[in-house]
A protein has these predicted regions:
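C-terminal binding/interaction regions
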Residues: 159
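Channel- or pocket-lining gating/hinge segments that regulate access to a cavity or pore
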Residues: 165-167
């Protein structure tokens, strides 16, 4: 899977489209807050924060799930409140603990806090934004399918993320994607090079057989 890490999510999205694969990725409701690109296996959980309540599961269950996965891990937490974002799971303390476990990414449809601290950690953070408080935050489940910002995630899914968003990589097509991405990039760069050259003409552009790019 190492070849996938060399590509940005738009290139891999193009490759998935050429492979005829239905895609699942985050929409504009989730943005990268900190960190760089990542490629890792999903560990999932759900949380609530808006109203008081008992913990459904201890945070240690999430840590155990992270430790059970070989290789880089992406923690994906769905805020299941009717209106997400009342409080944050991820901040300095929980972030430091997950950083110590070596995760590569964190994705949530909720909000996070302690942004300056998060920027110093070794994993990327994608969230709906920032908030002030922890509020009544508690985890309600670990290890079940979740949906964050339009992206459906099952535990064990392979996720690729960068400044554009987070994309699920189907395992049956993962090995084919780098070659397809390279093929598409060569086609696109030929068009870009022509557009920047002295050979470019408006008439030639109108004759170019392109459906979309």
């Amino acid at each position: 899977m190492s070849g996938l890490a060399d590509w940005e999510t738009p290139a891999l999205s193009n490759a998935l489209r050429r492979a005829g694969v239905t895609q699942s990725y985050t929409d504009g409701s989730i943005q990268r807050i900190s960190g760089g690109s990542f490629l890792g296996t999903a560990v999932t959980a759900t949380m609530r924060a808006r109203e008081p309540g008992e913990d459904g599961v201890p945070v240690a269950d999430l840590h155990r799930a992270v430790l059970a996965v070989e290789g880089p891990v992406v923690v994906v937490i769905e805020d299941v409140d009717e209106v997400p974002g009342a409080g944050a799971f991820l901040g300095e303390v929980n972030g430091t603990l997950l950083d110590a476990l070596g995760i590569s990414g964190f994705v949530t449809n909720g909000r996070v806090r302690d942004e300056p601290d998060l920027r110093g950690m070794g994993f990327a953070v994608h969230a709906a934004g920032l908030c002030v408080a922890r509020a009544h935050m508690r985890l309600t489940a670990v290890g079940l399918p979740v949906r964050v910002g339009g992206l459906s995630v099952t535990p064990g899914d392979l996720l690729h993320g960068d400044q554009h968003g987070v994309l699920r990589i189907p395992p049956e097509t993962a090995s084919r994607l780098p070659a397809l991405a390279e093929e598409i990039r060569a086609e696109e760069q030929a068009i870009v090079a022509w557009a920047r050259s002295s050979d470019f003409t408006p008439a030639g552009l109108l004759e170019l057989k392109r459906v979309r790019h």
